[in-house]
């Protein structure tokens, strides 16, 4: 059963610095208990529980960079994809179940990008979905 949910996207081209957080300022569906930082890079869950979190990152060309979820600024095990020097990808996606505590903060990060930037092409360069299940 879905208790609460939030969604946000980046629908314009954006330049993301090395190990930068992905801004998600567009098409926001705001949840009752999930708040968004002013720069649209951090999503805070007010109530702890089990959350299903999914993301998609599209780049304009294949990169060796990866994407991952951070919880309170720390990489969450099992929530990363890509980031392997021998593997170039232009679409990175993942979906995980996370046990979160009150006021935990979720961010989407691009990491291990030797070029220093990842260009996210329109119409949807990246999206993040957060669903509270319990």
Q: Where in the sequence are the language-model features?
A:
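Extracellular jelly-roll beta-sandwich "head" domains, especially the C-terminal globular C1q domain
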Residues: 1-134
